[in-house]
């Protein structure tokens, strides 16, 4: 079980949203590179970076920040947000990013997904499944769909993804615990490397996910508010 600290970027700064709402932005560190170094110092081996500006507009906005995180740390970097064409994938991979997270394009442009997986290798890609009230949401969580969780996972499996990260938007940034029923359900449907995200705020949450068979947990706001100490959680596992 791996604990992955999260860095969400808006205007080059490290922020957290509440339930994916862009009008509820909390600034936690104006220097995300410094934040990544702090995570590394605390024992993290991975970092989960999302370009929230990019997710909204459909192209990379905070690329330089992400490239510098990779340059100045030895962290394994997984990043997403607005990655919707081959040139952007190429840009991130050439900067040393280890994993590319694809979300909206899985449903909007599966041909593109097939192409980049063929060119760069499917092991470089993580599928992102974001949902609210049982239905998938796209475009930085701004766009509702009628796609169910099960239909979303079937699509992800058909495309050949070996890694999946899911987020229940209702729990994200709320510090009120994770949707464990969804965790069990998704674990049954997907047998690849599974990462949980959304509302993970206690050591108990992490141990419960581990017992369900989840492979990794992305933790955000709980680390920034001090509710969870990264060193303690890493030592726990």
Swiss-Prot record:
Query: Which keywords describe this protein according to UniProt?
Result: Amino-acid biosynthesis, Cytoplasm, Histidine biosynthesis, Isomerase
Which Pfam families does the UniProt record give? His_biosynth (PF00977)
Fetch the InterPro entries from UniProt: Aldolase_TIM, His_biosynth, HisA_bact_arch, Isoase_HisA-like, Isoase_HisA-like_bact, RibuloseP-bd_barrel
Localization annotation: Cytoplasm
Please give the catalytic activity noted in the UniProt record.
1-(5-phospho-beta-D-ribosyl)-5-[(5-phospho-beta-D-ribosylamino)methylideneamino]imidazole-4-carboxamide = 5-[(5-phospho-1-deoxy-D-ribulos-1-ylimino)methylamino]-1-(5-phospho-beta-D-ribosyl)imidazole-4-carboxamide
Q: Which residues form the active site?
A: 8 (proton acceptor), 130 (proton donor)
Q: Which GO terms describe its molecular function?
A: 1-(5-phosphoribosyl)-5-[(5-phosphoribosylamino)methylideneamino]imidazole-4-carboxamide isomerase activity
Task: Name the GO cellular-component terms.
Answer: cytoplasm
Keyword Phosphoprotein among UniProt keywords: no
Q: Does the keyword Phosphoprotein apply?
A: no
CDD domains the UniProt entry points to: HisA
What pathway is this protein said to act in by its record?
Amino-acid biosynthesis; L-histidine biosynthesis; L-histidine from 5-phospho-alpha-D-ribose 1-diphosphate: step 4/9
HAMAP family (UniProt xref): HisA
Protein family membership: Belongs to the HisA/HisF family.
Could you identify this protein by its name?
1-(5-phosphoribosyl)-5-[(5-phosphoribosylamino)methylideneamino] imidazole-4-carboxamide isomerase
**Origin organism of this chain?**
Caldicellulosiruptor bescii (strain ATCC BAA-1888 / DSM 6725 / KCTC 15123 / Z-1320)
């Amino acid at each position: 079980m791996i604990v992955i600290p999260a860095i969400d970027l808006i205007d080059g700064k490290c922020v957290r949203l509440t339930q994916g709402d862009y009008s509820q932005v909390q600034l936690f560190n104006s220097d995300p590179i410094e934040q990544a170094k702090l995570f590394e110092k605390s024992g993290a081996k991975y970092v989960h970076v999302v370009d929230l500006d990019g997710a909204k507009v459909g192209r990379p906005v905070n690329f330089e920040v992400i490239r510098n995180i990779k340059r100045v740390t030895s962290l394994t970097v997984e990043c997403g947000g607005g990655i919707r064409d081959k040139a952007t994938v190429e840009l991130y991979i050439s900067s040393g990013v280890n994993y590319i997270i694809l979300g909206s394009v899985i449903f909007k442009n599966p041909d593109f997904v097939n192409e980049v997986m063929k060119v760069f290798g499917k092991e470089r890609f993580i599928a992102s499944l974001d949902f609210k009230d049982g239905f998938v949401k796209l475009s930085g969580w701004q766009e509702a769909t009628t796609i169910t969780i099960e239909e979303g996972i079937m699509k992800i499996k058909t495309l050949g993804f070996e890694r999946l990260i899911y987020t229940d938007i209702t729990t994200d940034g709320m510090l009120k615990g994770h949707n464990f029923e969804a965790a069990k359900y998704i674990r049954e449907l997907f047998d690849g490397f599974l990462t949980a995200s959304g509302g993970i705020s206690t050591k108990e949450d992490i141990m419960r996910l581990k017992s369900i068979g989840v492979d990794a947990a992305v933790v955000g706001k709980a680390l920034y508010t001090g509710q969870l100490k990264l060193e303690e959680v890493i030592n726990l596992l």
